[in-house]
A protein has these predicted regions:
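A recurrent flexible, glycine/aromatic-enriched loop bordering the glycosyltransferase active site
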Residues: 122, 134-156, 172
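Short, acidic, metal-binding catalytic loop of nucleotide-sugar glycosyltransferases
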Residues: 27-36
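Conserved donor NDP-sugar-binding/catalytic core segment of glycosyltransferases
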Residues: 93-129
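Glycine-rich, basic loop-to-helix element that forms the pyrophosphate-binding segment
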Residues: 64-81
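A conserved acidic beta->alpha catalytic loop
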Residues: 41-51, 96
Length: 252
């Protein structure tokens, strides 16, 4: 059900050519979303024919002549959102029936959830990253974090508590881990809804269009580890709850 006047969900994705993947994403959203929603597509400098297509199929389209990057594109798309909840998903994903109802159920059941993510599999490697099942799983803080394949969040919390996506990272990776660590540092949890299995091709855009992808990846990895050094290397200390330890980590 699409209801532009008062959407419950704002679904945001990025486009940078690779139109067939975005078409499959849009098809899965249109066919499998039952709650009121709006679809926002941010085009990061695609060819003119792809940009025209984006304007035709999106409920709201943001068209840029140059690539704004992953965090920049999602931040600008989220700024347009009218929904109570945000789904920020890669354009090389496909969503199953009932995904929206189940993710809303989960985020409303867990008021301390900062991010709800579905289970997902890589279409290229046929390897599950978070296995599907019947339950809900809370990820241990400052440990294994989910990739930013599909983050489902409360819009106001995303903007005003977590501050959106960090702009410290280049176009390859790192911003999803940064947002997860920010959520944990603010005292919230990351929850996996195993009932929703999303098909994800995996780095279709970045690896196909960036000749120096690995260079960016290594630079972003160094930036992330510098910023989150104590949380990354000493997670057991970060999970301590004594006032003295909390005060020490607040200074990081």
């Amino acid at each position: 059900m699409k209801l532009m006047n008062s959407p419950l969900l704002s679904i945001v994705t990025l486009s940078w050519d690779n139109q067939p993947y975005t078409e499959a994403f849009v098809k899965s959203i249109r066919e499998n979303t039952t709650l009121p929603y709006e679809l926002i597509i941010v085009d990061n400098g695609s060819a003119p024919e792809t940009q025209r297509w984006v304007q035709e199929v999106a409920d709201r389209a943001l068209i840029f002549a140059e690539n704004q990057g992953f965090p920049g594109g999602f931040n600008q798309g989220a700024a347009l959102a009218d929904g109570k909840y945000l789904l920020m998903a890669n354009n090389d994903t496909e969503f199953p029936p009932h995904w929206d109802v189940r993710l809303v159920e989960t985020i409303e059941k867990y008021p301390n959830a900062g991010i709800v993510t579905p289970a997902y599999t890589s279409g290229r490697k046929s390897a599950l990253r978070f296995e599907p099942g019947d339950g809900i799983k809370i990820i241990g803080r400052f440990r294994k974090y989910p990739s930013g394949v599909a983050f489902f969040m409360r819009k106001e919390q995303f903007h005003h508590v977590f501050g959106g996506w960090s702009m410290e990272y280049a176009v390859a990776s790192g911003e999803d881990a940064d947002l997860c660590f920010t959520v944990w540092k603010k005292g919230y949890e990351i929850v996996v809804d195993e009932r929703v299995l999303v098909i994800h091709e995996g780095k279709v855009t970045s690896q196909s269009k960036l000749a120096d992808w690995r260079v960016h990846f290594r630079a972003n990895s160094r930036q992330f580890k510098r910023k989150w050094f104590y949380y990354f290397y000493f997670p057991y200390l970060a999970r301590m709850t004594t006032p003295r330890h909390r005060k020490a980590f607040e200074r990081v």
